[in-house]
Amino acid sequence: MAAAWLGWLLWALLLSAAQGELYTPKHEAGVCTFYEECGKNPELSGGLTSLSNVSCLSNTPARHVTGEHLALLQRICPRLYNGPNTTFACCSTKQLLSLESSMSITKALLTRCPACSDNFVSLHCHNTCSPDQSLFINVTRVVERGAGEPPAVVAYEAFYQRSFAEKAYESCSQVRIPAAASLAVGSMCGVYGSALCNAQRWLNFQGDTGNGLAPLDITFHLLEPGQALPDGIQPLNGKIAPCNESQGDDSAVCSCQDCAASCPVIPPPEALRPSFYMGRMPGWLALIIIFTAVFVLLSAVLVRLRVVSNRNKNKAEGPQEAPKLPHKHKLSPHTILGRFFQNWGTRVASWPLTVLALSFIVVIALAAGLTFIELTTDPVELWSAPKSQARKEKSFHDEHFGPFFRTNQIFVTARNRSSYKYDSLLLGSKNFSGILSLDFLLELLELQERLRHLQVWSPEAERNISLQDICYAPLNPYNTSLSDCCVNSLLQYFQNNRTLLMLTANQTLNGQTSLVDWKDHFLYCANAPLTFKDGTSLALSCMADYGAPVFPFLAVGGYQGTDYSEAEALIITFSLNNYPADDPRMAQAKLWEEAFLKEMESFQRNTSDKFQVAFSAERSLEDEINRTTIQDLPVFAVSYIIVFLYISLALGSYSRCSRVAVESKATLGLGGVIVVLGAVLAAMGFYSYLGVPSSLVIIQVVPFLVLAVGADNIFIFVLEYQRLPRMPGEQREAHIGRTLGSVAPSMLLCSLSEAICFFLGALTPMPAVRTFALTSGLAIILDFLLQMTAFVALLSLDSKRQEASRPDVLCCFSTRKLPPPKEKEGLLLRFFRKIYAPFLLHRFIRPVVMLLFLTLFGANLYLMCNINVGLDQELALPKDSYLIDYFLFLNRYLEVGPPVYFVTTSGFNFSSEAGMNATCSSAGCKSFSLTQKIQYASEFPDQSYVAIAASSWVDDFIDWLTPSSSCCRLYIRGPHKDEFCPSTDTSFNCLKNCMNRTLGPVRPTAEQFHKYLPWFLNDPPNIRCPKGGLAAYRTSVNLSSDGQVIASQFMAYHKPLRNSQDFTEALRASRLLAANITADLRKVPGTDPNFEVFPYTISNVFYQQYLTVLPEGIFTLALCFVPTFVVCYLLLGLDMCSGILNLLSIIMILVDTIGLMAVWGISYNAVSLINLVTAVGMSVEFVSHITRSFAVSTKPTRLERAKDATVFMGSAVFAGVAMTNFPGILILGFAQAQLIQIFFFRLNLLITLLGLLHGLVFLPVVLSYLGPDVNQALVQEEKLASEAAVAPEPSCPQYPSPADADANVNYGFAPELAHGANAARSSLPKSDQKF
């Protein structure tokens, strides 16, 4: 097979030589094949720019070059210079000037790498001027001219040694175009682009007149040594300079960015440390098992020691001792608080209407502040701290470069359309996906054109607003037309023209003729997006109608590698200018986006059978968050109603059917709910007076949260009032006061703990969470105060109504005389007393409970180490939001991450040579310059999260100044003398270059830098000068009035970022890179010590918090434990043991909650942190009541006191705490907002369930083992109270006994009168009480 191929090649070469014999009869050293110019190629009608003249056929000896001709040859083709007297060439002065002009376009791209530029020039100098031209050139086609004139050469063959050509190609293969963040060979290799380019394809493109730049056809033959050749042909094998070697004393080697061989050895970043293992077990799991085992063993030892101690104590029990001093101190807080609240409750109950009026006035006065409320809906203002580093960086960026443009984006995939094969004449057989079908493209073109021509009426502007009024127009920002607007899509490869999309043509390539159409042009443009004229017979441009390239990763998605034809999705992106919030153009942009969304919704509905469409506007996220907030308000209203109904029903004591209307508590329940709402409104109004902005999240969640807490207190208070019988001769007001003195310390303990936890939660810098925490903390305090005033007054009035046997709600009507309540024990109390408490505290069950809970604690310690940190933005959306599909498509199909800008602040001298060398990446720049470090980082995208190296205005500015390009020129005469002459001006008046020619890298002086930089930033790029900076850098450099660079930015791209963890790590990695760059640039002479480089990505403001949320959360939660313990310790009577057990239970609830968060898919972030802070406060509700009940019990043994607390306070906690939380929480599960569902429904459900389990299961068992000893002072006081109770009481006619002393006794729950210290403890029943 190989022999046959070589034979065919030899035959082809011989045939070619035979055909060309007429034009190149001699192949000898020192003989030319053509010489002098013969005008334009008559076979070409025109090109992208003015084409060079072709040469005349001339089989003559090479000419001796002297004088100006020699100087010109030495300057343009230095490798052909052999000295002043021995230099021969085959080109005239005109040919040299034409050669220089024709190479200027390509040299502008390659000049940043001197070796590449020189090698490229050398190739064409040899072709045109080599004195041995006939040895490797064979003319194959000429065009006859007039009589007596030599023919014009329009095609020839060039024979090169393959190694020679490949070395030349290798020297240029890595040269970059900074503005496009791509390789220069990508625009010099035709349909193959940079990915498929090689030496043969690179040379073929240069010799193809179809590219619009070549004046004649050149066929390049790359031959191996020893390969058969036509007679006389000797393949060119000239000098090729490696890119990592200097070309002279003053020239610099190519930089690492343009030449891999110049790169220093960059050690790869350290691999991620493997997980810590102990044997085959993960280290965390092993350590937690060891810790849990030690904890269980320690607990078992403590329990055993306590049991032995109790036995010894029982054996040695003698006469009862007098209370010790510590016990008296423990009693003191009980007594003080109990007496205070008893007196307070009695006074409030005595003046109910006055207290209600004063409470109403205070609430109204505070709530009036809501007239000044500022509702924040901007996601940036809600979820990013105003003083955070990311916000400061955003402010700096927006101030100096303007806000990041507004993105309106569409993803489209095909339904039920299978892929197909296409035999491309250019690239062979290719797979095309279903979405890449002509009928689909035509339909999407219609959609795109409808969107481009959208107009919407603006009341403020009193005219129609169109896209051109607000669009981002990089090449014409000042006088924008519709075709100047930046719209990126595959359709831009056809300039949004239906005729061009449907164009077809016949083309012959390598002897094969085939029809070429849009698919061939698409393949060409996807591989070479910088092409101005493709190599097909269609001869279409790949540039968008607004003048910039469309890179395939921005136009299609869902492909592998560079197989763009297999893309599953098409992407259309409309980029709009962004404006400050108070700019009237911002409202215009939002109006256009509103019309854009309506058009897309209509298109999605009408084409649902063909397309799957996902879309988003810049305003979409804010709109959807606001929409779901409004939609979910009824859910919260239903939650309120259910809690209200439960309270109203549960607070009643229904002893007889005939007394239901009287014993109902609907009015009291409604009053309790109104008290909670009043507290919330007052808290929000107070902060509105202070100018603290609020949010819709606060309006939704805070009332629900405070209702859950407030309902607990209401239930416990009323239930205690019903259970605590009125003493003989005791007035209603005194009865209420005594009840309040009994339960208010527990209510104070819980409310104070929760409020402190919320205020500590306000330490988080996230505005929405901080405001939520502040409002919740104040609302809980106000709720407690209103419960101590307004609700006590309501209870007094309700008790008066009930004693008068008036029906609830319709209290103005009196009823007939009703029978007294029937004595009956409630089902809940009976269940706890007869079944639950005996089972839980059985001697075999208690160790099992301890073991299970400690095992659960250990398992959740491990699970909490695996919780995800972050908050994906789609979770802030409702479940039915169209943005859910958009974010799904964005993560699935977009093949590049967001742009990241490395921003430089003021204080760095870019105009100095040292400053330029420290930031650029071309020849002469430092190996560890700013842009070079970003390049190194992009080689390790998995660690640096940078995938595409940065564009560099410094590099392109230097290239723009290079004399060999046609970019920076000056008028030499006329009124604009010495002013900038644009590259589009081809007159002889623009022959003066801005910079003089030098052997080394071009570096302007400070004066030249400040003069030429504004010209560069306003020069539009074009085919003659692709380095113009208007499109890429107009907004990237901020200049002061005297021309100093006060801020600039270098744009790179992240790799695709799929979730919040990726965004967080990308921010962390880019900051580390920027800090490293900053440290080096501060060493440049003249740099301000405060100079800084920082990374800016539009999403940084949202993900900044996740860099520190973990340590901040640990600190905040640990800080919450301190006041919780202190408050419990103080209000439990300076009882250290009770305080520690209380704290232990709360810590276990918290750890179990976090561990189960990982199981249920709840990530850790500022929203869940504030809920965990809430968990600490709510845990107090579940454990503190029972702990306090145990601490004040006078039963002789811990087991009896644990049973006592479980039966009476445990049942109250279940009915009053858990059952008031569950209805409201379960309703949250119906909310549309995923944020509410996940972080409020799921998390609060976990908190409530775990709090209930630890409070009613674990805590009684722990107290039965490790609880504090009985308080002897309390026992003594109870004994004295009992003795006083049996003594005869003096008559007091001023306060006669009520007629119906038991009218307000709830016999469904209440025991007989409990003997105990007045207002020092709850009415906990004795063992001999009757029910």
Swiss-Prot record:
Query: Where are the disulfide bridges?
Result: C32-C90, C38-C56, C77-C125, C91-C129, C113-C254, C116-C172, C189-C197, C243-C259, C256-C263, C471-C485, C525-C542, C920-C925, C967-C1025, C981-C990
Topology within the bilayer: Multi-pass membrane protein
Q: Keyword Transmembrane on this protein? A: yes
UniProt keyword list? Cell membrane, Cholesterol metabolism, Disulfide bond, Glycoprotein, Lipid metabolism, Membrane, Signal, Steroid metabolism, Sterol metabolism, Transmembrane, Transmembrane helix, Transport
Q: One GO cellular component from the entry?
A: plasma membrane
Q: Topological domain, Extracellular: which ranges? A: 21-282, 374-632, 687-696, 764-776, 868-1113, 1164-1165, 1228-1242
Annotated membrane-spanning segments are 283-303, 353-373, 633-653, 666-686, 697-717, 743-763, 777-797, 847-867, 1114-1134, 1143-1163, 1166-1186, 1207-1227, 1243-1263
Give the residue range of the signal peptide.
1-20
- Coiled coil stretches, renumbered: none
Principal place of residence: membrane
Provide the SSD domain boundaries.
Answer: 632-797
Residues carrying a glycan: 53, 85, 138, 244, 416, 431, 464, 479, 497, 506, 606, 626, 909, 917, 996, 1038, 1076
Places the protein is found: Apical cell membrane; Cell membrane
* Gene3D superfamilies named among the record's database cross-references: Multidrug efflux transporter AcrB transmembrane domain
Q: In which tissues is it expressed?
A: Small intestine showed the highest level of expression. Expression in other tissues including gall bladder, liver, testis and stomach is also observed. Along the duodenum-ileum axis, the levels vary in different segments of the intestine with peak expression in the proximal jejunum. Protein expression is confined to the enterocyte. Discrete localization to the epithelial layer bordering the luminal space along the crypt-villus axis. Protein expression in the enterocyte is observed closest to the luminal space.
**Function per UniProt:** Plays a major role in cholesterol homeostasis. Critical for the uptake of cholesterol across the plasma membrane of the intestinal enterocyte. Involved in plant sterol absorption, it transports sitosterol, although at lower rates than cholesterol. Is the direct molecular target of ezetimibe, a drug that inhibits cholesterol absorption and is approved for the treatment of hypercholesterolemia. May have a function in the transport of multiple lipids and their homeostasis, thereby influencing lipid metabolism regulation. May be involved in caveolin trafficking from the plasma membrane.
Query: Which protein family is named in the record?
Result: Belongs to the patched family.
The entry's protein name is: NPC1-like intracellular cholesterol transporter 1
- Organism (species): Rattus norvegicus
Q: What is the lineage of its organism?
A: Eukaryota, Metazoa, Chordata, Craniata, Vertebrata
